[in-house]
Amino acid sequence: MICALLALPSTIAHATPQLLHLGQPHPYVFLAYTNSDLHQAQPAEHAVVIIHGVRRNAEDYYQTGEQLLTNAGLTPRNTLLLAPNFLTATDPQASNDLPLWPKDRWMQGNESSAGHRGITSFSVLDDLLAYLADRRRFPHLKDVVLIGHSAGAQLMQRYAVMGKDFTSLPVRYVISSPSSYLYLDAKRPTATGFAPIPDNRCPGYNRYRYGLEQPPAYLASQRLDAVQLFRRYASRNVTYLVGERDTHADSKVMDHSCAAEAQGPNRLERQLGYLRYEGFLSRTWGVAVAHRQFVIPEAGHDAGHLFASPKVAEVIFPNKP
């Protein structure tokens, strides 16, 4: 087991793995890298949570988050940085008391299947928000930014759609360069608009995680139809990012399934297509939506490069101190 670090200064200069005690009434521990000693009450007014990609390299994403905060003029004293680590049983940090997922299933919201079993990655995000809203720990916290990139953005986009209502703190969602998105009906982008795909061309393309057929229990238990889901999603503060050079259709870490290819040939086109889809649903269902979208100049898929762009700091923190 990885031991929590108990004798640290209130703010920490470098990435430090700590165990967060999450979940009520069934507690569990979760590994995260952070710039603060979470065993003390914190002075932070803002929290930034950044979710890693498919390689589960949370420490690298912590460093990416540090650069982002530096570019935005934010310091460890006023801004808590957290980089949670969704682990598998083969990762060196794994232990039996941590939730562990089979390979990339965490990005879909699935339950942990080893270590501490039965924890969905959506529940982890719910529990992280509840943890941050605890005034005993964070008496001055004003808002939370949830950032996901690549595989982390696949989780984040689905959580932004399906996550339960949270009213304790304002939450902003940043969805950066995922391979696919959750569509809310059977239509997909075409050259002239949106239309269903014939079943014989792509069987199962509308099943979860690409559509709402056969949804996970986390969503099914909420008993919301597609219009209700979209209305809630449209009301949330969502920002989309993608690099202008994230156009490699043969990328080894991009989803090449038929269901993903139905959303576009590359990450740039898939994101722009989804923004058009939001506009289509807005007109069709009479739901106003104003999510922001930014193509980052000269950036490809690399998280360190994309989030180092001064433009990204301006976009994510428009009201920085």
Protein language model regions, located:
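Bacterial N-terminal signal peptides
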Residues: 1-9
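C-terminal catalytic histidine-bearing segment of alpha/beta-hydrolase fold enzymes
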Residues: 33-35, 241, 275-321
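A domain-start/cap signature at the N-terminus of enzymes
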Residues: 11-47, 55, 59-80, 106-123, ...
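Structural cue for short, hydrophobic secondary-structure segments
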Residues: 50-53, 83, 240
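The feature captures the conserved acid-bearing segment of alpha/beta-hydrolase catalytic domains
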Residues: 170-280
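Cap/lid segment of the alpha/beta-hydrolase catalytic domain
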Residues: 86-119
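Conserved acidic catalytic loop of the alpha/beta-hydrolase fold
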Residues: 123-142
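Active-site glycine-rich loops that stabilize anionic/oxyanionic intermediates
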Residues: 53-56, 179
